[in-house]
């Protein structure tokens, strides 16, 4: 555990997202690089039932979110009705939605839980103890996979055919063999906001355990923005160094 705590000691700004449409990439923050002890720790949480690691890994995610919110404190002041921008203290605090990357139903059944959801819930618990009263965070699981027969709207024919043939878990497995552009193409149209009304006009932060090429996060940004959410950025426990992204 001391070695893991040391690996999570510094939050870095990561340049990982490369949207295909040329839009500005959202800011990415991670508490560690995905190397050394981090792969073992995160895989232990995901595949070995090591939920006892949640407090420490959740602390890493919480620090990433905290640094992102601090970097955007001026932007948060402009949220209508926020107590940050009000002269008095009667206005409600700004509520930031922490939105976990989705897990496939198959992986949840296999593990018995969704690791990203647990990490986000733990991070939210820790953040609400640390943040000023003018800012609150809430874990909200609103992103899901589009049924495979409806995927790929607006994507290339090959992407639509591939998306149709792959389940959510198969899509994730297939992505491991693709480069950054291939992963982004495969993810386009694969996600949806299950409760758009919950996100409209709200500030959100996308959260995951690991950011690699950013294909999943970029697609989450796209669908959240289409639902009217203001996405501040992407936060993760760890990020794969660029030289390791293939």
Question: Model features per residue range: what roles?
Answer:
Residues 1-246:
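Glycine-rich phosphate/pyrophosphate-handling loop used in enzymes and phosphotransfer proteins
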């Amino acid at each position: 555990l001391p070695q893991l705590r040391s690996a999570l000691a510094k939050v870095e700004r990561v340049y990982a997202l490369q949207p295909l449409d040329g839009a500005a990439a959202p800011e990415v923050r991670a508490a560690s690089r995905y190397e050394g002890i981090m792969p073992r720790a995160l895989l232990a949480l995901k595949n070995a039932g090591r939920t006892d690691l949640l407090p420490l890994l959740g602390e890493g995610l919480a620090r990433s979110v905290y640094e992102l919110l601090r970097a955007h404190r001026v932007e948060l002041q402009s949220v209508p009705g926020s107590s940050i921008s009000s002269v008095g203290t009667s206005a409600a605090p700004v509520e930031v939605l922490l939105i976990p990357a989705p897990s496939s139903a198959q992986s949840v059944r296999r593990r018995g839980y969704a690791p990203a959801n647990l990490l986000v819930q733990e991070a939210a618990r820790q953040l609400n103890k640390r943040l000023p009263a003018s800012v609150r965070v809430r874990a909200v699981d609103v992103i899901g996979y589009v049924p495979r027969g409806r995927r790929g709207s607006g994507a290339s024919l090959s992407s639509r055919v591939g998306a149709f043939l792959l389940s959510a878990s198969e899509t994730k497995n297939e992505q491991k063999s693709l480069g950054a552009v291939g992963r982004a193409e495969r993810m386009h149209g694969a996600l949806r906001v299950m409760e758009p009304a919950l996100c409209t006009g709200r500030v959100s932060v996308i959260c995951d355990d690991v950011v690699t090429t950013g294909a999943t996060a970029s697609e989450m940004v796209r669908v959240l923005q289409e639902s009217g959410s203001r996405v501040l950025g992407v936060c993760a426990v760890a990020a794969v160094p660029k030289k390791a992204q293939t």
